[in-house]
């Protein structure tokens, strides 16, 4: 307020706002409304960036033009920065957006109001940021906002091997697609084998069928991340064979395992 008088001479090129961050978010929401195509939102205590990249890769392999979060920009400033790219290029067919939180202040719910998700992917609930949220239960409640904010006709993609995540299925009356390794799920990896080259071989199972898959990444966590991506591909009409073929060409994001 004290600088407002100094800025008056620039009024023809400035917009005054009571809260610059809220105004920035509202601007991004307006750009989203003008674009109005599917949004896949991804959250979890770990693996968000890898799962987001895998999901974007799988969808792009089907010929779709995919907007994805810039770097790990997943908060109230980072998400709008990504979304505003639609103002200069609205030819994207779909957006895969990472949504994070670190405090018990409805962060994810507020992010969802900028870009309401058509598909919400919840990866896991782990004691990350527990110093701010107090308990694993509170972390789960915060992550669950991604499911609660789903569009009525949206789809929740939930990790069946994480009980805190899988219990979120009760929060959405619409479609649920589960994925997992240990527990029975809609999308699964079976007959898993790790080779000496750091690659993972498995049978990919979806409701559409089965196909042999080769993932050039190692570790159970990466299998789960690719199953989340496979579930999204299935939701958008890809065959199991198409999804498995796309996994063969993925690469880990920089500095990610």
Residue ranges and their predicted role:
Residues 3-12, 118-257:
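Acidic, Mg2+-coordinating active-site environments of NTP-dependent enzymes
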Residues 12-22:
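N-terminal pre-Walker A segment at the start of P-loop NTPase domains
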């Amino acid at each position: 307020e004290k600088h407002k008088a100094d800025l008056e001479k620039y009024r023809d090129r400035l917009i005054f706002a009571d809260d610059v961050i809220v105004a920035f978010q509202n601007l991004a929401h307006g750009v989203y409304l003008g674009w109005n195509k599917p949004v896949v939102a991804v959250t979890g205590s770990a693996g968000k960036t890898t799962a987001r990249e895998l999901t974007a890769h799988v969808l792009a392999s089907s010929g779709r033009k995919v907007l994805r979060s810039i770097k790990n920009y997943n908060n109230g400033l980072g998400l709008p920065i990504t979304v505003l790219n639609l103002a200069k290029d609205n030819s994207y067919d779909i957006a895969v957006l990472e949504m994070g939180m670190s405090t018990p202040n409805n962060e994810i719910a507020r992010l969802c109001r900028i870009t309401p998700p058509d598909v919400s992917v919840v990866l896991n609930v782990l004691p990350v940021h527990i110093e701010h949220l107090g308990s694993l239960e509170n972390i789960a409640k915060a992550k669950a906002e991604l499911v609660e904010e789903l569009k009525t006709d949206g789809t929740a993609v939930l990790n069946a091997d994480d009980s805190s995540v899988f219990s979120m299925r009760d929060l959405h009356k619409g479609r649920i697609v589960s994925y997992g390794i240990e527990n029975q799920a809609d999308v699964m990896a079976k007959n898993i084998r790790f080779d000496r080259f750091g690659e993972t071989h498995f049978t990919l199972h979806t409701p559409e069928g089965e196909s042999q898959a080769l993932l050039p990444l190692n570790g159970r966590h990466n299998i789960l991340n690719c199953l989340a991506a496979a579930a999204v591909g299935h939701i958008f009409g890809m065959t199991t064979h198409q999804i498995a073929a796309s996994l063969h060409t993925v690469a880990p994001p920089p500095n990610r395992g």
